[in-house]
Amino acid sequence: MRKLLLTAFAVFTLFFADAQLKTPAPSPTQSIKQDFGLSAIELSYSRPGVKGRMIFGDLVPFGKVWRTGANNATTITFGDAVTIGGVKVAAGKYGLLTIPDKKSWVIIITKQTDVTSPADYKAHQDLVRVEAKTMDMEDKIETFTIQFSNIKPSSCELHIMWDKTAVSLPISADVETKVMAQIDQLMNKDNRPYFGAAMYYMDNGKDLNQALAWFDKAVEMQSNAFWIHHQRANCLAKL
């Protein structure tokens, strides 16, 4: 009995000692918050390295659901509704899964936020499935990377890259409808956003005469604001 207690104590001591030792994570976690449209998209995933291994078709098998990272499930959170693959996805937190293959991947947005292995995956929880052609890269990406690119007012792309393979997922948002609704609402109030509304009309190819009228109102309110005069001149040049 005494020997058993001593053994248990030794094991506990070693475990406690190891628990105090902090070392770098083999696949560190990254969280990204990207402003997009009128809100933001947040992404959380872990980043394994190539480390001399063969990645796709070996470490990551072809034709099987992949958590798209390491450790925990990869999640994506939309602050506002977006459209992916022609499907409207409501604001909220979702899982980001993929099924890699040699020439194309299936990218999945799922209600499941805890998938870490193919056995956990439930296809009926899918919201979106998009086929994305693979792109061969000249330079190797040692650390698994997901990033946003080509960010525009109402569209962006989510790039998934590792080793010498990349895929891209287009994302869009109906920004115009919401901005126009805001303008209509705020123009019926006392403190009207003449300059902001005029800029939106001018920058997005809308009614320039209306934009000019709003610039004129903005000048009346802030006659010494040189930037308003400058943008008003830009509007006149486009008429």
Tell me what each language-model feature is.
Residues M1-K22:
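Bacterial Sec-dependent N-terminal signal peptides
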Residues T74-M187:
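Long, contiguous interaction/recruitment modules in multidomain scaffold/adaptor proteins
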Residues G196-A198, R232-N234:
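Structural register within alpha-helical repeat arrays
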Residues N204-G205, L239:
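Structural motif corresponding to the intra-repeat A-B loop/turn of tetratricopeptide repeats
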Residues K217-A218:
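Canonical positions in the second alpha-helix
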